[in-house]
Amino acid sequence: MNPNYLDFEQPIADLEAKIQELRKASTGPAVNVDAEVRALRDKLRVRTAQIFRDLSAWQVSQLARHPQRPYTLDYINTMCDEFQELAGDRAYADDKAIVGGLGRIDGRPVVIIGHQKGRDTKSKVARNFGMPRPEGYRKALRLMKLAERFRLPLLTFIDTPGAYPGIGAEERGQSEAIARNLMEMAELKVPVICTVIGEGGSGGALAIGVGDRTLMLEYGTYSVISPEGCASILWKDAAKAKDAAEQLGLTAKRLKGLGLVDKVIREPTGGAHRNPEQMGKRLKAVLLNELDALEKVPVDALMQQRYERLRSYGAYEGH
């Protein structure tokens, strides 16, 4: 898969193009460009490290939305020995923007739920661009209760611009579906680990985002609104999205500092899409480590810790 370069990655694209040109020029035995290629590769590594060392919040937002970024099903395929997807909310329909089911990770049974976007036009429409409707959140709730019934740990993967705001979704109770999930997840009697793998957009993300641990990939985002939406409201100008991204504090590093995220998982240089296999293995190792810790905690203590965790959000000291 050829990388889809973002605007701030243009120096990287230029260097990689030069390397490709040299390779094409060295097709004959009389031409040896190994030294030049090595020099360019060294320069590429240095330049890439420089660019990704100090990304702005807006640049991180672009990476979180990268069209080649791994989605929930990609991670499931990498991490799970086996996986059986379950469909439908048993009331209205099957929302393809939410996927979930039963799986095994290194033989350990788990329930997995996550947002799912599409790759091409057809699948993007089928997945509604990763924006769930009420039936998607009710499907997720069905799987949550299944996890509780069979005492299986729950893993959720968050990657959505937000819940779908269409008229039909509102008529079918979008806000109620999200609110119910928040309430039910707070009381699930099994370990729950939530991971932001891409975009974490407002209530659409929170509806599968309440748990005992909140993990976040290095170039993910988590916010009450998109930078463009925030800019349109505050400055009446979507072009000020860069400023809005900084003000929203939506990056993993910032949220970890605020105590809203427990662990930031480092991505491969250039982002998860540059090496999805490596990212999947790294995420798997972290999840298994967190599960080992949580499964040692008695249920009553787990519930109390989760309650105290949720009550701590937004707390401040002052006169």
From Swiss-Prot:
Annotated GO MF terms: acetyl-CoA carboxylase activity; ATP binding; carboxyl- or carbamoyltransferase activity
Domain CoA carboxyltransferase C-terminal: 32-293
InterPro entries xref list: Acetyl_CoA_COase_a_su (IPR001095), ClpP/crotonase-like_dom_sf (IPR029045), COA_CT_C (IPR011763)
Subcellular location, record wording: Cytoplasm
Entry keywords, A to Z: ATP-binding, Cytoplasm, Fatty acid biosynthesis, Fatty acid metabolism, Lipid biosynthesis, Lipid metabolism, Nucleotide-binding, Transferase
Pfam families, alphabetized: ACCA
An individual GO BP term: fatty acid biosynthetic process
Biochemical pathway: Lipid metabolism; malonyl-CoA biosynthesis; malonyl-CoA from acetyl-CoA: step 1/1
NCBIfam families from the UniProt entry: accA (TIGR00513), AccA_sub (NF041504), PRK05724.1 (NF004344)
HAMAP family assigned to the protein according to its UniProt record, in alphabetical order: AcetylCoA_CT_alpha (MF_00823)
Name of this chain's protein: Acetyl-coenzyme A carboxylase carboxyl transferase subunit alpha
Organism: Xanthomonas campestris pv. campestris (strain ATCC 33913 / DSM 3586 / NCPPB 528 / LMG 568 / P 25)
